[in-house]
Amino acid sequence: MPPPSPTVAELQQQLANGEVTVREIVEAALARIDALDQAGPSINAVIELNPEAIDIADALDAELASGEMRSPMHGIPVLIKDNIATGDQMETTAGSLALVGLKATADSAVARQLREAGMVILGKTNLSEWANIRSFQSSSGWSGRGGQTVNPHQLDRNPSGSSSGSAAAVASGYVAVTVGTETNGSIVSPAGNCGVVGIKPTVGLVSRVGVIPISHSQDTIGPIARSVADAAALLNVLAVPDPEDSASRGEWPITVSAATPAATPEMTILPIPSYPAQPDGGVPVVDYTAELDPTGLQGARIGVVRSQTGFSPHADAVFEEALAALVAAGAELVDPVEVPSGADPAWGADTLPVLEWELKAGLAEYFAGFLPEGAPITSLADVIAFNEENAADEMPWFDQAIFLNAEARTGLDDIEYINAVIRIQAAGRDNGIDAALAANNLDALVAPTNGPATRIDLVNGDHWLGGTSTLAAIAGYPLVTVPAGYRHGLPIGITFMGGAYSDATLVRLSYAFEQQVAVWQEPAFTPGGILPPA
């Protein structure tokens, strides 16, 4: 079997020493994919390979031969999630058959940045279709176009999602780094279940332009990698301010008039929603690899969010081991830390409706901007109709109930929507993460990422145990998940969370933790069945 991908640092050193060419790196990655993705364990993480990958590699080799190096990531291959537009020969479908053949007319900002850095976009990864916003009964990692991605640690286990293929591809050693997207948990959850590192950046740090959306208030794009160092190297490429992105500008895209009538007398207009508050000077441009300090936990004050435990005894046991490792590395724990909004479940009723409102508007905007002129898909209603007409292929396992709810929503100037966004943002920020950090003078919070992977169940859908991503999702704040241990051969991670634009701090803390525990294991590609003892 072809060996797994070297790390980013190893590839960089090999290229610098002339030990390998970009073409050879790309060919090795393609060989690994060929051996594992549709053959052997059949991980099914890759939905499409880039037919131009070898030609791109040759061009990058020629640049190196002439002394030109675009960035430290020159020549490094990357796989990107199939909701990130590329204006090339590849499709961009969000896993949906409705978009097959309607190739994007331009690169997304992320794809453009990867190319400008000299990275080779090797292909697209499978995902939970439409980033898991179609149905309440979905199976993470399944799409009508791509089928079901499996977990490389045990092949009958779910990889989680929605960036399922991106996490499974890194865990399987196809490439050192991939790109995922997250609205709520879609980077950190699959990274946790597949035993790799995932960084969910602050909303606004990475441009969303050209990414098939769910939510303009919560969507973000980030790296998935085998190590924090590799993820930080990719984050340097991705984290570029973009005036075309409303979150990067820090300007809420909907103008609300104070004279707009409320739907009911009780629904008064609150302040206009906002994106995460930017530091002076705007979106920070940081070298995240400069944060890779093995002593980075010394003197750090970290709050333990006990309210986010208890959903899995296995996750709880690994979490206790992780807390001991944090102390051993020099951190000071505040245990427990109370998150004020955690005691008030009322805001939870607003979270999905906000996504439904924003999905309907966001898809129409993406289709108008990135699909070819005359495309038969221009709205969510068109996607719903396509699914109904092609139900045997698109809905063999689960329906489109969330799509139907979203289509029934009104516009983004609806006061009910505006107030709902404000309520959940307050729960995530002023009464949530910000409150916990400020009250205890903390650098970050920590909690289990999720439980060990459950079995794939296409008939009933995901068996969700629990996770810690929601507060950061509604706040628009960053998360980093790192492998912390294993139970029965299945990985379990912990998540560091912080305030707006604390991404660099979280990279520093997570790197130091990773070096302290050093638990990462290659997946065993174990066939389905009874798990081994812990």
Locate each region found by the language model.
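An N-terminal boundary/leader segment
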Residues: M1-A65, P261, E321-A324, A328-A331, ...
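Glycine-rich, small-residue loops and helix-cap segments
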Residues: G18, G75, E116, V175, ...
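Loop/turn elements at helix/coil->beta-strand transitions in domains of secreted/extracellular proteins
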Residues: T21-R23, S42-I43, M69, H74-I76, ...
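Acyltransferase
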Residues: V26-E27, D58, S108, T289, ...
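Conserved hydrophobic/aromatic pocket- or pore-lining residues that grip, position, or stack substrates
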Residues: A29, A53, G75, K81, ...
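Structural helix-boundary/capping segments
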Residues: A35, E116, V120, A171-R306, ...
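Short glycine/serine-rich loop/turn segments
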Residues: A39, M73-I221, S246-W252, L270-S274, ...
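Short helix-loop capping/hinge segments that flank enzyme active sites or metal/cofactor-binding pockets
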Residues: H74-A94, S257, E291, G296-V305, ...
